[in-house]
Amino acid sequence: MKTWSHVALLACLSIKWLTCVMADSIYCDDPDMCSNSVDLDRKEFFPLGRHDGVYQTPEEDGDLEDRQTRGDPFLRFGRGDPFLRFGRGDPFLRFGRGDPFLRFGQSDPFLRFGRGDPFLRFGRGDPFLRFGKSDPFLRFGRSDPFLRFGRSDPFLRFGKSDPFLRFGKSDPFLRFGKSDPYLRFGRGDPFLRFGRSDPFFRFGKQQVATDDSGELDDEILSRVSDDDKNIRRKRSTDSAENAHTRHEREASAPRAKGKVGEVKSSDDFQSREIRSKPYMRFGRNNLNNYALEDEDCKLTSDIIDDQFQRYQRGPSRSSFPRYGKRQDKRHDYMRFGRTSGGDFMGYDKSPENVGAEQSR
């Protein structure tokens, strides 16, 4: 590094000395700006630096050096404890680390964003309307607030808890998830629920009825649902095979047709025994102890449970008019499709069936 010459250093010192001398001898046109009176501090209001920026006399607030070492101004940006300050301190409406009101950072303010216990704070604390991990009202995080989104027990909360109108895993009212709420969509036993349960006006499959008529948990419901799926897959496979060999069965003798129908219906009724009987249900219902070739009509009427406007499969003496074919000439109600024990109201063009239809 090249050093300065003695001439350059002497010139700098001379200029500095002349500047100080001339500054002391200059006549100022504005006495308010050049005097040591109180008005010198007016220009220090709202400053950006290390002084309070408050209009005070030197006697009231001390000298300038003492005030510069402190950091307590109003609306100051830096290090201190001001009001509406951005930095490190404990101000009001401050952004940084402190305990202010409406502060953004790590503290316990009101309407603060960070870590603390404020009101309407975003972060970790126990505020009102806070977003983070705490116990506020209308908070988003992990806590027990009202109208909170997270894991807790609030009202109208979205997460894992037991609130009212909650979306998640719990037992709330009007909840969407796995629980037992009212108007719930999922797995549970609610009212007006869409899923797998025992509700009123439910769309789905009923769970297996127990002896104590108790509610089943999600694990049991899952197993029941898997069994129902297997039954449906088996029935679909059987239907596909029957459709593939439909021409052969129609060309075969009526005796062979009766055997095929008997085997199919026996499997169908065994699968029905594990299903339930809801109200106004659309689908298939079980008929406990149902016999296909019952000659006694009273036995059939005693076995079948009385249901109101239920669309199901199986014969029912006390039911609404059904459209189909029956070998035992009993009435089924308003059912469109195939039934066990022979397809009724179908068009079987075998000679024996044509003669039977004409004799009727």
From Swiss-Prot:
Segments carrying the region annotation (Disordered) are 227-272, 312-360
Q: Which GO terms describe its cellular component?
A: extracellular region
Basic and acidic residues bias spans: 227-252, 259-272, 325-335
Where does the entry say this protein is expressed, by tissue? Expressed in 57 cells including a cardiorespiratory cell and the visceral white interneuron (VWI).
User: Which InterPro entries does the entry mention?
Assistant: FMRFamid-related_peptide-like, FMRFamide-related_np, Serralysin-like_metalloprot_C
Positions bearing Phenylalanine amide: 77, 86, 95, 104, 113, 122, 131, 140, 149, 158, 167, 176, 185, 194, 203, 282, 336
Question: Subcellular location, in the record's words?
Answer: Secreted
Which residues, renumbered to this chain, carry the PTM Tyrosine amide? Y323
Instruction: Name its GO BP terms in alphabetical order.
Output: neuropeptide signaling pathway
Keyword line: Amidation, Cleavage on pair of basic residues, Neuropeptide, Repeat, Secreted, Signal
Q: What is its main location?
A: secreted
Looking at the record's lineage, which domain of life comes first?
Eukaryota
Q: Which family does it belong to?
A: Belongs to the FARP (FMRFamide related peptide) family.
Biological role stated in the UniProt entry? SDPFLRF-amide inhibits neurons. SKPYMRF-amide excites neurons.
Q: What is this protein called?
A: FMRFamide-related neuropeptides
Q: Write down the species.
A: Lymnaea stagnalis (Great pond snail)
